[in-house]
Regions:
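Short loop/turn motifs at secondary-structure junctions
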Residues: 74, 100-102
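Glycine-rich short-loop/terminal segments
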Residues: 1-52
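Residue-level "edge-of-site" marker
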Residues: 82, 109-110
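A sequence-level detector for short glycine-anchored, His/Arg-bearing signature motifs
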Residues: 83-99
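Short hydrophobic/aromatic-enriched beta-strand-loop microsegments
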Residues: 102-109
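Short alpha-helix boundary/capping and kink motifs at helix termini
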Residues: 34-87
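Amphipathic, charge-rich alpha-helical segments that serve as recognition/docking helices
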Residues: 54, 58, 112-144
């Protein structure tokens, strides 16, 4: 299943972000966790109706999400924009906060680069692309 995230009406392909990172090997930057802009009360987990704080307050009720936080592999950098918004790595971020860590590594993408990962501008993150469409999209945005 394709891995996407959304900000406003823009839906971004996290899979394309991983491909970009693996092919072009940008440097990860050490950042202060306080520079990350994440609302722990924002609804968006599960079916979009629970928050991180809901999960942390009710770990038995939200066992799957709670386990994902605890099992998050901290060796992978977070992917974020220049404003501190996370595009991939929320579970890692939450785990780092719970461990009282102060810093982590992050790939920081500016708006120009992030625009290349947009796969939908209608806010419909259920729209699926076929594998050939992802390959063509990557080629058009990064190779041509």
């Amino acid at each position: 299943m394709p891995h996407t995230t959304s900000k406003g009406k823009n839906v971004y392909s996290v899979d394309l972000m991983f491909a970009y990172i693996n092919i072009f090997t940008p440097k990860a930057t050490k950042i202060n966790l306080n520079d990350i802009n994440y609302d722990m009360d924002a609804k968006g987990w599960g079916e979009g109706n629970i928050s991180v704080n809901d999960v942390l307050k009710n770990p038995k009720k939200y066992k799957d999400d709670y386990d994902r936080i605890n099992n998050a592999n901290l060796k992978y950098p977070i992917i974020m924009d220049t404003k501190g918004n996370i595009f991939d790595g929320v579970h890692r971020y939450i785990k780092l906060k719970l461990l009282n860590k102060k810093t982590t590594k992050a790939y920081i993408f500016d708006d120009k680069l992030l625009n290349k990962f947009i796969v939908n501008k209608t806010g419909d993150y259920n729209t699926k692309l076929e594998i050939n469409e992802y390959i063509e999209l990557f080629y058009k945005k990064f190779i041509k």
